[in-house]
């Protein structure tokens, strides 16, 4: 089988390779997501970081041959489905509570944007987002495009910890932290649903090629969903 995807593999350091596409008519994030999954399943002890327009691969230059890895990557692209650009496969609605207890940076967001609380919430949840990529932590979904009216830069001083389900905004993206951990984005709310669970057949609830809609809920609804 001959690969239908013209890729370029660049050496960016002695232990890092970067895979790029020459073709711009396909869904870049989904292509690199598929390739990363094929690489992980091949059990070749490679670390992969899929991005929106490239894939970075880390290997051990002492134990692994760079040229053999390149050849393996070319072969793996042969089994990737043709990811047509802008073709979304499924839609998911994610409930969000924007109460102060969960919206840790709402005050700063209001000051930065000059909008009212209701307007900020409306700008965030009254639109459809595309899953651009998965990364940073297991299941973290980068969603776009965020409304221009509530675009903020990343935090100058990232938080060392936010609870799982926290929803952040930064630049033209919004994202959900599926597990507790550090966060460099402004936290606008939190969802009670479990986005990453290793006990599920598919541990990730949100995947590339999905469309996502946020739905505002009250604190009592949040707590009820958390108990279910």
Regions found by a protein language model. Give the residues of each.
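Glycine-rich active-site loops that engage anionic ligands at enzyme catalytic sites
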Residues: 2-228
């Amino acid at each position: 089988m001959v690969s239908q995807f013209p890729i370029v593999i660049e050496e960016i350091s002695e232990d890092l390779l970067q895979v790029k596409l020459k073709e711009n008519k396909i869904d870049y994030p989904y292509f690199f997501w598929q390739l990363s999954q094929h690489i992980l399943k091949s059990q070749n002890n490679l670390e992969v970081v899929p991005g929106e327009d490239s894939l970075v691969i880390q290997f051990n230059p002492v134990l692994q041959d760079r040229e053999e890895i390149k050849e393996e990557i070319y072969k793996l692209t042969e089994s990737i489905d043709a990811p047509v650009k802008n073709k979304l496969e499924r839609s998911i609605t994610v409930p969000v509570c924007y109460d102060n207890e969960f919206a840790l940076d709402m005050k700063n967001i209001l000051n930065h944007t000059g909008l009212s609380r209701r307007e900020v919430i409306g700008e965030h949840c009254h639109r459809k987002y595309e899953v651009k990529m998965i990364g940073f932590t297991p299941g973290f979904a980068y969603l776009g495009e965020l409304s221009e009216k509530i675009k903020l830069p990343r935090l100058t001083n990232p938080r060392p910890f936010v609870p799982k389900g926290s929803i952040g905004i930064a630049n033209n993206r919004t994202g959900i932290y599926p597990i507790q951990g550090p966060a460099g984005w402004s936290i606008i709310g939190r969802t009670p649903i479990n986005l990453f669970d290793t006990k599920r057949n598919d541990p990730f609830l949100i995947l590339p090629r999905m469309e996502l809609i946020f739905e505002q809920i009250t604190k009592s609804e949040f707590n009820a969903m958390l108990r279910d």
